[in-house]
Design a protein with these regions (language model features):
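Structured-RNA-binding interfaces characteristic of tRNA pseudouridine synthases
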Residues: 1-230
Length: 230
């Protein structure tokens, strides 16, 4: 996961430790989101404040990648405006959730194997309702720091990449704690025929977290992109 936590490694902790070592002062790194343990990120954005001589960004990128663990890579470092904030300045975020329907040992750490048939047409039909809905209280895990459960979803669809592999793509201005994994679990219930589209709509508009589907495992979830209006 991203966020520093006791008795566990995190991306934030490793980045702060590496930056502090190279810049020879205590550094704080702020990420665009708080991915849970086991969730991956292809394009996480983060910022740190710096007062001092101009940094050589390419050289700092190179040196960071030399000392960071093998499962963390810095792609680029850019100077931005002083009021830029990795989390609060983001205009949208995109997540993918990967599933496969045939056993594949090479996919098992990054995709969830489905051992039952799914109706992806029904799942996509249900997913389209997210584009016209704002309140996602039914898909929010208790205990988060969200002051509101309102989100603006602009993309929600299942995409097939091979006869046996799919991913769910969802883009929104913000996401609630555990929201994507709960959304995927509920859509899978639709695809299995466990709930009808009308039942799905009732959960969407009137439901609580206990009415929605189970939270799917984190290892198949990827933060794919964070966008900013610069």
């Amino acid at each position: 996961g991203w966020q520093i936590q006791p008795n566990a490694n995190s991306v934030q902790q490793e980045l702060q430790k590496a930056l502090s070592t190279l810049l020879r002062r205590d550094m704080e790194v702020v990420g665009a989101g708080r991915t849970d343990t086991g969730v991956h990120a292809r394009k996480m954005a983060a910022h740190f404040d710096w007062e001092g001589e101009e940094l050589d960004a390419p050289q700092l990128t190179y040196r960071l990648n030399r000392i960071l663990p093998r499962d963390i890579a810095v792609k680029d470092i850019k100077r931005v405006a002083d009021d830029m904030h990795a989390r609060f300045s983001a205009s949208s975020r995109t997540y993918h959730y990967y599933i496969h329907t045939c056993k594949d040992p090479f996919e098992r750490h990054y995709s969830l194997q489905m051992n039952f048939p799914l109706d992806f047409d029904r799942m996509n039909q249900a997913a389209r309702h997210f584009l016209h809905h704002k309140d996602y209280a039914a898909f929010c895990k208790a205990g988060g720091d969200n002051k509101t459960t309102l989100c603006e979803v602009t993309q929600a669809k299942w995409v097939q990449t091979s006869p046996s592999t799919w991913y769910f793509e969802i883009t929104a201005n913000r996401f609630l704690r555990n929201m994507v994994r709960a959304v995927v679990g509920t859509l899978i219930d639709v695809g299995r025929g466990k709930i009808s589209e009308s039942q799905f709509l009732d959960i969407l508009h009137n439901g609580t977290r206990s009415d929605a589907g189970e939270s799917m495992p984190g290892h198949a979830l990827f933060l794919e992109e964070v966008r900013y209006d610069l």
